[in-house]
Amino acid sequence: MGQQVLKSSNEKMEKAVAAYSRELATVRAGRANASVLDKVQVDYYGAPTPVVQLANITVPEARLLVIQPYDKTSIGDIEKAILKADLGLNPSNDGTVIRIAFPALTEERRRDLVKVVKKYAEEAKVAVRNVRRDGNDDLKKLEKAGEITEDDLRGYTEDIQKETDKYIAKVDEIAKNKEKEIMEV
């Protein structure tokens, strides 16, 4: 029973770190990256639709993103949605494609992005710690029910703590790499 709690906690911590990595992909670091548009929803025939479902997105150059809509009539809606998403991007529409040039980041903007990265990192650490707390609670319930001994409880609790430390270190490492990428000029 205790092993199942450990395995479950480990999987949940892994998912929390993976979610954090996906979240960081949306933080732009001066280079064009299609994932910055992942959360942009276009009002397409009355239904909110992700840009990635409406257009082909390519990165022909390091600082340029090209969006080629499958339906040319939706180009204006896509452009409006990008502006409305407030990503700090200025799309230019030539009638067939939308081009987004990524300007070089200012020092101030870089610092703001580092703060965002740190905020996301803290949220990821809290998620990992919540998994640890839930796992420890489950283990205590098992011990109360007599399914594991007090010694087992202590051992499993230490194992969960080791996993927690490992995943928090992973979050710190990912954050450090992203900060380095952002501060690169």
UniProtKB/Swiss-Prot annotation:
Subcellular location: Cytoplasm
Gene3D superfamilies: 3.30.1360.40, Ribosome-recycling factor
InterPro entries in UniProt: Ribosome_recyc_fac (IPR002661), Ribosome_recyc_fac_dom (IPR023584), RRF_sf (IPR036191)
Keyword terms of this UniProt record: Cytoplasm, Protein biosynthesis
Pfam families: RRF
GO BP: translation; translational termination
Any one of the GO CC terms: cytoplasm
Single Gene Ontology MF annotation: ribosomal large subunit binding
Domain of life, per lineage: Bacteria
Protein family membership: Belongs to the RRF family.
Function: Responsible for the release of ribosomes from messenger RNA at the termination of protein biosynthesis. May increase the efficiency of translation by recycling ribosomes from one round of translation to another.
Descriptive protein name: Ribosome-recycling factor
Record organism: Bacillus cereus (strain ATCC 14579 / DSM 31 / CCUG 7414 / JCM 2152 / NBRC 15305 / NCIMB 9373 / NCTC 2599 / NRRL B-3711)
Gene that encodes the chain: frr
